Amino acid sequence: MMQLLRRLADQGRTIILVTHATANITLCDRVVFLGQGGRLCYFGSPQDSLKFFGVNTGDFADIYNKLEEEKTVLHEAKRFQNSPDHQRYIANHLSHPTSQQTSNLSPKKVSQNPFKQLTLLTRRYFDLTRRDLVNLALALLTAPIGISLIPLAIRDKNPLILGSEPDPSLAPLALRVLFVFTCAAIWVGLSSSLQEIVKEAAIFLRERLVNLGLIPYLGSKVLILGSLALLQTLLMVGVILIGFKSPEPNLISWQLGVGITTFLTLLTCMSLGLMVSALVKNSQQANSALPLLLLPQIIFSGVLFKMEGIASKVSWLMLSRWSVGAYGSLVNVNAMIPAPTKFPNGTTLPQPFEATPVYDPTWHNLNLNFGLLLLHTSVYLTVTFWLQKRKDIF
């Protein structure tokens, strides 16, 4: 191997070799010995290195033995800096700028074009996504398939429209159906994004060293995941419109309202997934975090349990609360609650579900739900940016 490298060097090529093998090292024109911490202990010809370190055996391995201790490394590095070999092999080969040239020298930072980076990263991320057809199909079809099973479970009931006769079980049933819509969106949103940063951790750090911008990097993630969320929304809304009778619109059309709510829920969940992906250390931790993220969304959504006291405050931190709230406002769940049944003694029959401002069919309430979902998205992406920025090593 060394003979081959010598022939290549004789042909005019520059060969740089990092090795601990000392056999045939005399074939090299120059050798470099580095001590602990990358300190330069010697640079020059192989024969002169033996003289410099006082090795009389002719074995270059003895030089390694001399440089094992840190104190020796510091001493030899300082000695070489003041030696004739340093002057001969290094100082004499360096150009010395004039004082005028020195004053004009200033560090130049390589400029970056964020739009070009965004385009390149988005194209690369898109190519990676479309090549993994199995995961792409699962991401697109999981929620629609799950939602399509609901009509089989509730049989001939129409949970999203008010019937001609009062039904105390209609409002709770409608909420459960809407809750499944939310859970399906949360599940696919998180599972689509939890791996997207942590799996590229090593690549990100390398590219960051060559001027990769954080905003283009995260922007490419948001663009592709947002496009995926749009496709998922179209499929989910299509299944919902086919499988369930549409309620009468109170504010906006059901088709538009359910589409906006589903898309915002998916986008918010994907932003949460990116934040967690930037926080964890490896892909296994990201997978393990999925149940931990999903369970609080279920518990504090306000559907399974009544939110009172501190639980009502915690529910504000859950995107599921705002997603179900938006769905409930569009359906007007409160209007499905029949008038209470009064007994002759003046008491009333307890209702399985009571009207709540969370599902008021007003523009204020609907905009509040949409706005809080967008606020969650902004917070998650901001924290993601901060977490990625902390990983910089320069």
Language model regions located:
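Helical "lid/switch" subdomain of P-loop NTPase nucleotide-binding domains
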Residues: 1-4, 21-27, 38
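Conserved catalytic segment of ABC-fold P-loop ATPases
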Residues: 4, 14, 27-33
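Hydrophobic alpha-helical transmembrane segments of multi-pass membrane transport proteins
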Residues: 150, 167, 171-242
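Membrane-lumen (extracellular) interface motif
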Residues: 25, 130-133, 137, 151-174, ...
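Conserved ATPase "switch" residues in P-loop NTPase domains
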Residues: 9-10, 130, 208
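Topological signature of polytopic alpha-helical transporters
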Residues: 30-174, 178, 319-394
